[in-house]
Amino acid sequence: MNLRTGIWLGTAALLLAAGPAGASGLADWDLKPASVELGGWAASLGGTANLTGYRANEDAGAGRTGGTASLFLDPEVSRLLANGWRVGAMGVINAYHDQLSGDNYGNDVFQKSYLFVATPYGRVEFGQQDGAAYKMAMTGPLVADAIAIDDANITFYRDPTTGEAFTNVFAVRSGVFATKNDAKLSYYTPRLLGVQLGVSYTPHMVKDGLPFISAGPHIADRQDNLVDAAINYTGFFGRTSLGLYAGLSAGHNAARTPGHDDLFDWALGGELDYDLGEATLALGGAWHQSNGYTLDPSDAFAHGTTHVVHASTKLTAGSWLFGLEYSTGTADAEAALPKLDTTGYEASVGYRINSNLQLTAGWQHLRFTRDSGVFYNGLPRANMEAGFLYLRFHV
């Protein structure tokens, strides 16, 4: 870490330390989504705004100070029936994002749009939504999800040759994300004795709002008839709470080319929380493996795998959160594709100003290597680090 990064991080730490005093007028905030009822139907609109300032350093380049932002809207319409069932529709609209944030679903404005039925016998979802193997994932505690290394929705490093986020070369993720927000049908059981089951069926890897409408483009090695299955468990034992997760996604290669195969993607994870009295300590992690190169379901090979390991810990004391995160991943070489390795570390401190606002400061270091070819910097390796100050507003 160089001097300029140290200065930036020191400034961020001072701002974070001033948070409680400066936020005294905000401490009583408890904003709820805007809502209205009409003819037995209830409609609401919530959302999340992310704003991040950072100082990043990369190989073969000068340090760079910048900012990134994103805005999501969460509309919902539902009706409670006389039998206690609730029916409705939900969505997530990516109202704004730049090239470094909010892009986990591939630039979709309408990231999610689905119908649901919630009953005492379980919940059914029908439409453009996460699959069961991702939605039920437990992969370790985080101070702030969006800026974590694992499943990052905000990054600080740009490939100057493309203008896109450099981390897209191998985006590590420890939950099974193979069916993304493709149109699907899902069912989740009620939780019984701490156990919940989930299953999803995705006919085709397309985003047409509802499944079975379109088969999508007929491209080579496309996966059809994908099935997600997941199980998780939550239990409490005195001062200890335990969460465990297993998920998988399997598909059929409908246009197989030599060397490619059906998709098989699976993960195991968990988290252990212990109540210390004045604070809570959480530990967790996950293992994720897929035959999709760099976890890409459209590039599933017959031999070789990609795997990701994630470990994290978090200490929560009142409104303060302290976290450490470690992630590593390897994508085996395939045909003309190089072997890729990535390792990352992150330390962060968060302060919950109120139920709507959280301020987080931190530092992360990432390293990427390849066994053939070079990255944009002309080297087979890329080292990068960043200090950041992140504000999340959620209603």
Role assignments for model-derived ranges:
Residues 3-6, 10-15, 19-46:
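N-terminal periplasmic/intermembrane-space "pro-region" immediately following the signal or transit peptide
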Residues 74-76, 114-116, 186-188, 230-232, ...:
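Outer-membrane beta-barrel architecture
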Residues 32-51, 62-207, 233-236:
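Outer membrane beta-barrel
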Residues 51-55, 93-97, 130-132, 201-205, ...:
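Transmembrane beta-strands of outer-membrane beta-barrel pores
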Residues 382-395:
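Outer-membrane beta-barrel "beta-signal"
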